[in-house]
Amino acid sequence: MPADPSTIADGVRVAIFDLDGTLYEGDGFVPTYLEQLEEHGGLDPELARGELDQILGGVHGLRVGDLYDPATDRVLRAPAWRIIEVTDWDGRSVDDLRIGTGIGYGQGLVYIGDAWQAVRAVALHHGVDREASRASFQAVRVRINTAADELLDTSALAPVLAELDRFEYREVMTNTPEDLARPLVASMGLPDRFHAVRFGVDKPLGLERRIDEVLEEFDVTPDEVLCVGDNYLNDILPTVRAGCRAIWVDPFGTAPHEGPEVRVAGLAEVAPLLRDGR
């Protein structure tokens, strides 16, 4: 049963925020990402952009909330983390022995939780190898570090930062390596408002470990920990499984999950929730 949005922050002492797609929004980085994939991996940017728009718009065989299996080029639909349908890239159902089984970590699947992972899936589908994908990702992150105002939308950030003093401890956790994200974090002013920023944390498993550490380090109960993020698999699922509170920033209207998290369409809706909890 979903939590009451008006009390989601009541009694919370520790807050953990995701970075990409949470504290900034928008997909202004996508054209640069596709250009890099063309340069490093030969991806057709116009074809890729068309497919990406369909994926993010919910009118493609692969949708936000699905998992893509690059080994078989198949799409796995698992709304409750048990596979109920497998399709090809274009959405045609196929027989697959995995139907009815659960989803686990470390299976080489790409969870489509945001535009970053949607681009990754499109590239893999069209044969861009992992090395070219990695080089493209690194190049676009470097570009973001020097052109964040042009590529990212941080218009809703300041009101959220203004509400953080209510928490005894707050930190940012991101899977992006420090050398690729530290300049962006600094330009957003996050070190001034968070006690720590952790890079390359290997979510979702890294978040599971960090929650365990936080419970002991700050002598808090799970109900006194709040996590805010946009990627359900990486940010929200580990949080609710640990019994903590969660705000899911879901701009794509992903297929509903019967979970206890509060879901919002964008970062602008987060600040009022933090304010209401006082």
Located regions from the model:
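Asp-based, Mg2+/Mn2+-dependent phosphohydrolase catalytic module
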Residues: 1-13, 158-162, 171-278
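Active-site neighborhood of HAD-like aspartate-dependent phosphohydrolases
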Residues: 2-54, 60-67
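Short, acidic loop-to-helix structural element flanking the phosphoryl-transfer center
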Residues: 11, 16, 112-113, 145-171
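Catalytic-loop motifs flanking and including active-site residues across diverse enzymes
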Residues: 29, 115, 210
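Short, surface-exposed acidic
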Residues: 41-53, 127-138, 192-193
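A metal-dependent, Asp-based hydrolase signature
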Residues: 58-143
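Short, contiguous strand/loop micro-motifs
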Residues: 106, 147-148, 222-223
